[in-house]
Amino acid sequence: MALGRVGLAVGLWGLLWVGVVVVLANASPGRTITVGPRGNASNAAPSASPRNASAPRTTPTPPQPRKATKSKASTAKPAPPPKTGPPKTSSEPVRCNRHDPLARYGSRVQIRCRFPNSTRTESRLQIWRYATATDAEIGTAPSLEEVMVNVSAPPGGQLVYDSAPNRTDPHVIWAEGAGPGASPRLYSVVGPLGRQRLIIEELTLETQGMYYWVWGRTDRPSAYGTWVRVRVFRPPSLTIHPHAVLEGQPFKATCTAATYYPGNRAEFVWFEDGRRVFDPAQIHTQTQENPDGFSTVSTVTSAAVGGQGPPRTFTCQLTWHRDSVSFSRRNASGTASVLPRPTITMEFTGDHAVCTAGCVPEGVTFAWFLGDDSSPAEKVAVASQTSCGRPGTATIRSTLPVSYEQTEYICRLAGYPDGIPVLEHHGSHQPPPRDPTERQVIRAVEGAGIGVAVLVAVVLAGTAVVYLTHASSVRYRRLR
């Protein structure tokens, strides 16, 4: 009995463990059974049962780790914002192809604007121009692309175009080159009403500015309006002028950036014989505003002097900023020349003063001055001009008759390039005694003149006495 009970207990425990193993085996997620291709229920393969000898063989696959599935909310990328195309013309009351054109000085500019559907008989277009200051904000225009509704043209503008000129206020101010009878015409408007183009024939500092397009019916001319800003730019012209210097003078060169607009930064960088000049004390730059734009002049002075080495070559590099993002850069080079310092002498020979200058450039002449008179003396003669042994130079001589009234003489060289100091020589000479015969003649002439004057005075006095005597006698007779 005891042994039977023990055997029964062992059997039950064995069956329990077999059942647990079978349950765990069937519950394994990695165990799959492949039975041909998937299909409808009518095409499904028969069940895999050991009783069915013709059943297909099952192929177990190794267990695969489960893949963690992410929620769509965590993996989905944010959708890009929908692309918005240009607004349809039909939904906009005004649309211009360019609201802020920038064009070169002297170019021809066209601006096209489209307005609501209308007919010629009931619509009216006006275009007004407003001047803008240099580098100023838009001013009266709140936004270049904003459509103004029921807003009249602000005061202070000049009328450029009116599609109904017979309705134009007679007190309106037309812009130069616009209006009836304007010649030459600076503005023209072409195209059908509602799809018109404004043509600025020549863009200048005077024709740039803010243009206000105002559109409406004849009985409501300010229904819609829009602003267009027209800006002009003009690159600078660059020239370099290396100064001619005398021996002993420092080398110099001047660069000029002329007639550019707008007047943003124009920066110069100087190079002397290929080496940059960093000392600000050697560079002087000045900007000036002119009616046709701006001009900047920059001058560099070298530490080297003429005659102590070869001539210097200067290069100026100009960087002009058209706006905050655009700039242009140009270079100009030139070599300074050295002129010999002339020797000037003065001597008095007889009745003439003679001035001589050696080794002066061709084309240089003398100018004479006497005493404190700032006007050159008239009687000047160049006696001779000979070579002095240096190419392009000569020795010149000038003579001047001596003066009987002045004692101070100045002979000055004229015709040197700009920047050369005044070169002159001062001399003194006492007036020579006059010839005795000449003195006698002068005295005789002076005596004759005095005698004639006395005679004329006597004749006039006698005539006056006779006239007064005759007048008194006539009056006496009338009284009797």
UniProtKB/Swiss-Prot annotation:
InterPro entries in UniProt: GA_GC, Ig-like_dom, Ig-like_dom_sf, Ig-like_fold
Biological process GO terms, please?
A: adhesion receptor-mediated virion attachment to host cell; symbiont entry into host cell; symbiont-mediated suppression of host complement activation
- Region: Heparin-binding domain; residue ranges are 106-120
Query: Signal sequence span per UniProt?
Result: 1-27
Q: Where is this region: Disordered?
A: 30-101
Locations of Low complexity compositional bias? 37-58
Major location (coarse): virion
User: Disulfide bond as a keyword?
Assistant: yes
Cytoplasmic topological segments? 469-480
Could you tell me the keywords of this UniProt record?
Answer: Disulfide bond, Glycoprotein, Host-virus interaction, Immunoglobulin domain, Inhibition of host complement factors by virus, Membrane, Signal, Transmembrane, Transmembrane helix, Viral attachment to host adhesion receptor, Viral attachment to host cell, Viral immunoevasion, Virion, Virus entry into host cell
What the entry lists under Pfam families is as follows:
Marek_A
Topology relative to the lipid bilayer, per the entry, is:
Single-pass membrane protein
Transmembrane residues, as ranges?
448-468
Glycan-linked positions:
40, 52, 117, 150, 166, 331
Spell out the note in the miscellaneous section. There are seven external glycoproteins in HSV-1 and 2: gH, gB, gC, gG, gD, gI, and gE.
* Assembly notes: Interacts with host complement component C3b; this interaction inhibits host immune response by disregulating complement cascade.
What is the protein name for this chain? Envelope glycoprotein C
Q: Which organism is it from?
A: Human herpesvirus 2 (strain 333) (HHV-2)
Task: From the UniProt record, report the name of the gene that encodes this protein.
Answer: gC
